[in-house]
């Protein structure tokens, strides 16, 4: 079922990161889809950018069309909190909260889940641990945690590259999306009902309020469709498509 809404979002024009394309400006329009997926907690685009890939707390990975239809890809029972794709080979990476691990689903069949590395700094966080994984570049991923709003960079072989906290402006990291065009990170904070835009080294650029989204735990910037996809982990899982303008 598709519901269409118009809302007034207070969107400010914000400058781009580094010397890349500017950060998009959010518009008034959004749509919401009810999705057949329990506890949606991670989103990214597939390799061809023809659909979304999604993961859920119950350990499922699905392909979701841009109109909300879901198709099963993989299930393991692990507490999946974040999903991202390596664009060079199509491998899927998953953030597993209970064990604080990053797992891999090798392309193209996605029928085997293997351990990549442990996030040792989050080993004591339990159910307040890692919530997001996001491919950056040169075989480096970002990993974000709920507790402490920690942001780590890891090589995919498990080597820690850097560690910072976004706690100056965020109460948690519920989801991450790296926008290559602007060289910026988008960060969802479900507790504050906000989405932040910051540089890759954690300098805040701006923020957007999303009071109409109950529990934003998944986030994907889609420049081809000029929108932001936001997954909300509610009683009935919802996928929001929020329009933006490329500046």
Where are these regions (language model features)?
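Sec-dependent N-terminal signal peptides
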Residues: 5-14
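Sequence/structural signature of beta-propeller domains
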Residues: 17-247
